[in-house]
């Protein structure tokens, strides 16, 4: 029997974005936001969304919350290259429904933080920002018009 995992997505795994086909989970409600500010950047030649694990810096990041099973979480982990120290790491983060009251109970869920090593020496195209939009994704050099 597979376990249900809740994961906050803020980049290419969001509905409408280029890696959404990997995200075969069930969306939970509308938008969600990090309970604490975190810096989100668009970096490098691929213009990747890069959320750093620096609570208290940046802005509250807006994204989507999904419930996924073990197989989908494993597919997401492969996409995000958890075995490579220059890519992402999966950690817990507190999120709340957005918009919503600041004192609403926060939920602890999974998120992919970009590694500090992967951030170093990259060109920063935008950030800190509160949301990775479709218009930001549209300028990805591998995206076809």
Segment roles from a protein language model:
Residues 2-145:
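Glycine-aromatic micro-motifs
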């Amino acid at each position: 029997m597979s376990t249900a995992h809740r994961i906050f997505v803020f980049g290419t795994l969001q509905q409408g974005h280029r890696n959404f086909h990997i995200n075969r989970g069930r969306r939970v409600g509308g938008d969600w936001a990090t309970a604490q500010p975190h810096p989100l950047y668009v970096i490098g030649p691929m213009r990747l969304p890069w959320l750093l694990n620096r609570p208290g810096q940046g802005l509250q990041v807006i994204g989507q919350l999904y419930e996924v099973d073990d197989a989908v979480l494993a597919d997401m982990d492969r996409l995000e290259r958890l075995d490579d120290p220059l890519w992402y790491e999966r950690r817990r983060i507190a999120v709340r429904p957005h918009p919503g009251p600041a004192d609403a109970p926060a939920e602890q869920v999974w998120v992919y933080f970009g590694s500090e090593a992967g951030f170093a020496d990259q060109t920063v195209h935008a950030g800190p920002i509160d949301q990775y939009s479709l218009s930001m994704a549209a300028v990805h050099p591998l995206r076809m018009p």
